[in-house]
Every structure is written in C-alpha cells, then in structure tokens.
Amino acid sequence: MRNSWIQPRIGQKNITQMNFAKNGHITEEMNYVAKKENLPPSLIMEEVARGRLIIPANVNHVNLEPMAIGIASKCKVNANIGASPNASDINEEVEKLKLAVKYGADTVMDLSTGGVNLDEVRQAIIKESSVPIGTVPVYQALESAHGSIERLTEDDFLHIIEKHCQQGVDYQTIHAGLLIEHLPKVKGRITGIVSRGGGILAQWMLHHFKQNPLYTRFDDICEIFKKYDCTFSLGDSLRPGCLHDASDDAQLAELKTLGELTRRAWTHNVQVMVEGPGHVPMDQIEFNVRKQMEECSEAPFYVLGPLVTDISPGYDHISSAIGAAMAGWYGTAMLCYVTPKEHLGLPNAEDVREGLIAYKIAAHAADIARHRAGARDRDDELSHARYNFDWNKQFELSLDPERAKQYHDETLPEEIFKKAEFCSMCGPNHCPMNSKISDETLDELNNKLTKCDTSV
C-alpha cells in the first residue's frame, strides 16, 4: 500500500512524519490516520509537528497500515512477543503476531533475545505484520558480542540500531536516559533494575566506567532514525519493579533526562514516545502520568501496566489492567499489555490472547472515561442487543466473540437458544429483562403520579 507514498521521498535527508508536519505537509500516512481516528488531517499534522502524536512508519515497512499514538487519538495497546534461549521457534512467533493482531494489538514488539537467528525472526515478523513493529536493539547488541559486556563497543550498539532500521522496524526502545550518575540512586530498592536493556547498559557503564553510549551518541542515533523515519521509544531503564520502588529518586532522575532527550530528538524532527512504569500503587498513577507530561513536554506516554499489586502472579494481566485503565484515563497514549505469565515465563498463544483482551478492555474504558467521540457507541449497541436477546449480535460486538459464544454455549448449546429470551443464569422465568415495561406504560404511570402530586 505504501510503495507509491514512499518512492518520492527516497534520497531526501529527513523523511520523518514530524519533518513533513513541521513543514506544513500532510502525508498520505497522516490522511490515512485521520480517517481511522475520525479526526481532521490538519489536526493530525499539527499534533505530529508539536510532538504530541506519532505515526510510527518506517519507510522499509511497506505493508504497514499507519496508526497514531497520542493524546488526540484513541488509547492504543501493544503486545510483546519474541523467542528466548529457552523457548524459541520462528513459526510460533509469527503465529503469536497473527493472534495479537486478530485480538486487537495496535502495535507489536519483538523482544527476542536468543534461541533463533534474531534477524530472521524479526524479518519474518515484519513481513507478516500490518501493524507497527518495535524492538529493543541492545538485546541483539549483547547477543552479537556472545553475551560479553566487556566486548561490546559503542559502535556495536549503533550498528545494530541501523540494522533494525534497514529491516523496517518502526520504533525502537532506546535506553538513553540511564546515566552513570543515576546508578547509586538504585540503592535501597527492593528489586533494583528490572529493565533488561537497562541492566545491560548498567553493567556496561560499571565495567567501562564510562557514560551510557546511547546517551553520548544520541545525536548519531537521531541521524540514523531520520533516514528511515524510525521512531524513538525512550526506554525507562529505572522503572520500578515493585510497589516499594515506585516514584523514587532513581525513576524520576531518569525521567528528567528522558525529557531532555525528547526535546533533543525533536530538534532533529524525529518522532518520540516515552516509556513508563511498571509497578505503581493506584494513588500514584495520576502523579506519574502528569509528571511525564510535564518533564517530556507532552510527548506520548507508553506504559507497561502498571501493576497495582505485587501479589498476583498468574493474574498479573488483571492487576495491571486496573492500573492501565487508570493510566489511560489520565492521558497515557499507549498501554503495553501484561500476560498471565508475567514474572513466571514466556507467554504462549493463549497468554497473548488473555493479555490482549484485558488491555483492550482497559484502553476502551479509558477512551470512554475521556469522552472520546463515539467511544461508547459499541457499548450502547451491545446493550440494545442484550435487551432484545439478540445473542448473535452480542457475540459479534464483544471484544472476544469466540469466548463469549463459548461461555453461552457451555450450558445452552442448541441453536434454538440463540433466540431464547433468557440465559442459564436466570432461566426462562426470572430474567428481569424478559418482562419488558413499555414506554406507554411508563408514561401512563408518570401521568398518574403527577396528578397525585398535584392533588396533595
């Protein structure tokens, strides 16, 4: 779809959506996004130029269907997939991608760390994906050095970053906000550094006693990104890994640096979103969202969860969806899903499904709470179908039609019950919606009550 859009841009020094927007040009991607979001193209252009909205769309990802992440657009959901040294198969990861897109993932991150050829699995995922693909390049940088922090050089990091751009990755998590002077602030935490990328860079800085190379070479990374229109997802290396560590000095020190880097990327006209926690008590979620908006000049916020309790292994998709709904309500632009396997193991296909549905609920609830135009239309349509006992319509409008039908059919599987005015909860004689009271009856009652009031 995008081939004809991209061809005229070849050879230009800066082909980012932000660069076009700042120059008053509405791209085909902006027009496409405007139709999907039911917003004026001029507003999309203005928000991209301002940095409040991004369209992750690498020019080498030609089969991409552009989408928007930002406060002006609907709240989005990301799904993480990826092979590990202990569980790996390219075909399985491609199937996870397809399942994620089926159940509504707006973007997908390939977090593969080993066990397969990382280039091959990434290329297979990008080839099959119509949604933006994100990666964390430091994983492959470490793998390319055979797991040796000592052998990793600054150029190794940049080489992998450009390789990901060349392959069509739409956004990359760049852990540039973690500075060597932040590391002592981790003392006193219960869980220390829980970001894999952050942990790699912390070890690199400690070994070499040098500043974070992704920070010192940040302008070089911007030069790479502007050639491909790759978007920054600025990683939060010091995100809290438990409630005890939330909103501490380490997290907030890095956030301040992320704000500085956001504005530096904008001077290059490179798009940015900023990643956030993590594990946060409910009473601190609003503070975290507002603080990010303040420090990062309203760049789109992209949070993992956050989990609102630490005692829910096996059910972390529920704990985190509670926090995600609140974060979305307060203005977070994209929610990174958490699966039931979080903290326990690599998610399988069913875990991907469970996590995504939980997060589609959270994002949708946030859109309703933020009074986005049309956000509640589907809810109202389903409610009408429920009141009219239109079971097939209810299934169709559900976030997970297959699961809704499965649960209904466990007790009433015959086709005749698709027209029944009851379910197995109340049975045929006790459903309150079965005894409908007409509007005429209610009007008549209201008239009688009015007369009674008048006569008193």
Swiss-Prot record:
Cofactor note: Binds 1 [4Fe-4S] cluster per subunit. The cluster is coordinated with 3 cysteines and an exchangeable S-adenosyl-L-methionine.
GO biological process, alphabetically ordered: thiamine biosynthetic process; thiamine diphosphate biosynthetic process
Domain of life of the native organism: Bacteria
Keywords per UniProt: 4Fe-4S, Iron, Iron-sulfur, Lyase, Metal-binding, S-adenosyl-L-methionine, Thiamine biosynthesis, Zinc
Entry binding sites for [4Fe-4S] cluster: 423, 426, 431
Residues at which substrate binds: 80, 109, 139, 175, 195-197, 236-239, 275, 302
The protein's enzyme class: lyase
GO MF annotation list: 4 iron, 4 sulfur cluster binding; carbon-carbon lyase activity; zinc ion binding
Catalyzed reactions per annotation: 5-amino-1-(5-phospho-beta-D-ribosyl)imidazole + S-adenosyl-L-methionine = 4-amino-2-methyl-5-(phosphooxymethyl)pyrimidine + CO + 5'-deoxyadenosine + formate + L-methionine + 3 H(+)
Cofactor(s) it depends on: [4Fe-4S] cluster
Protein residues bound to Zn(2+): 279, 343
Documented EC number(s): 4.1.99.17
Annotated metabolic or biological route of this protein: Cofactor biosynthesis; thiamine diphosphate biosynthesis
InterPro entries: ThiC (IPR037509), ThiC/Bza_core_dom (IPR038521), ThiC/BzaA/B (IPR002817)
Signal peptide extent: none
A GO CC annotation given for this chain: cytosol
Family per record: Belongs to the ThiC family.
Cited function: Catalyzes the synthesis of the hydroxymethylpyrimidine phosphate (HMP-P) moiety of thiamine from aminoimidazole ribotide (AIR) in a radical S-adenosyl-L-methionine (SAM)-dependent reaction.
HAMAP family associated with the record: ThiC
Protein name per UniProt: Phosphomethylpyrimidine synthase
Source species: Prochlorococcus marinus subsp. pastoris (strain CCMP1986 / NIES-2087 / MED4)
Originating gene: thiC
